[in-house]
């Protein structure tokens, strides 16, 4: 009976975890939509509303995990899973935080985002980095819920794509700074945008490592 109750509570936590992941995916996508379209209302919604939703998910999941540890005394695999989930939701919250930083740049650089170079030279790689991070996050959660942990090992190639894009864009932006020092503030913000998405990729890889550890019980480096 106790074991059945613990299993049911873990399923509830995993349902919350899945929903939190879906919310994070939407925030990443919306942040890029706001950036491309200069949608200040969408940017403000992400900052004022969506970020709170993520915080609420984090609080609720941490609370449920704490209650299970205190009342059900899980051991071995179950305890490992609960402790890993607490770390996973922290990484999800940080991903959402980086997406929020992206939309803050929307409000800061509103007039500069009309620049032809932004859409053609700077935005396309940002979109590619964001889409790659989203695909990574979706794939590792699918692997976790499907029980196919070989898929998690394949996300290394995705993180490599993000790292290469970041490295390339960093070089392009730094070169532009040297040639156009009068645009330093604008270009610094472009560099920050790339940095935010590179960190998103790192956090997704960390989640993959934790999900792999939950089931296999072995540490793996996905970065």
Curated annotation (Swiss-Prot):
Keywords: Cytoplasm, Phosphate transport, Transport
Subcellular localization, as worded in the UniProt entry: Cytoplasm
SUPFAM superfamilies recorded: PhoU-like
Keyword Isomerase: no
GO cellular component labels: cytoplasm
This protein's record includes keyword Cytoplasm: yes
Family annotation (InterPro entries): P_transport_PhoU (IPR028366), PhoU-like_sf (IPR038078), PhoU_dom (IPR026022)
Major location category of this protein: cytoplasm
A GO biological-process term: intracellular phosphate ion homeostasis
Function: Plays a role in the regulation of phosphate uptake.
Subunit structure: Homodimer.
Name listed for the protein in its UniProt record: Phosphate-specific transport system accessory protein PhoU homolog
Organism in which the protein naturally occurs: Borreliella burgdorferi (strain ATCC 35210 / DSM 4680 / CIP 102532 / B31) (Borrelia burgdorferi)
Organism taxonomic ancestry: Bacteria, Pseudomonadati, Spirochaetota, Spirochaetia, Spirochaetales
Gene name as annotated: phoU
């Amino acid at each position: 009976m106790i074991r059945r109750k613990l299993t049911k509570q873990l399923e509830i936590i995993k349902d919350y975890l899945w929903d939190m992941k879906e919310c994070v995916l939407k925030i990443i996508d919306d942040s890029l939509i706001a950036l491309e379209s200069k949608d200040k209302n969408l940017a403000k919604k992400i900052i004022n509303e969506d970020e709170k939703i993520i915080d609420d998910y984090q609080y609720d999941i941490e609370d449920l995990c704490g209650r299970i540890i205190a009342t059900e005394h899980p051991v071995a695999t179950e305890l490992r899973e609960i402790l890993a989930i607490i770390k996973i939701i922290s990484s999800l919250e940080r991903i959402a935080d980086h997406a929020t930083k992206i939309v803050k740049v929307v409000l800061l650089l509103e007039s500069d985002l009309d620049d032809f170079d932004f859409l053609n030279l700077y935005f396309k790689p940002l979109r590619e980095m964001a889409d790659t991070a989203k695909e990574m996050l979706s794939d590792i959660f699918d692997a976790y819920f499907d029980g196919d942990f070989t898929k998690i090992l394949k996300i290394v190639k995705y993180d490599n794509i993000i790292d290469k894009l970041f490295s390339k864009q960093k070089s392009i932006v730094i070169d532009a700074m040297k040639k156009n020092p009068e645009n330093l503030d604008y270009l610094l913000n472009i560099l920050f945008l790339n940095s935010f998405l590179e960190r998103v990729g790192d956090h997704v890889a960390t989640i993959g490592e934790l999900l792999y550890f939950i089931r296999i019980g072995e540490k793996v480096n996905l970065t």
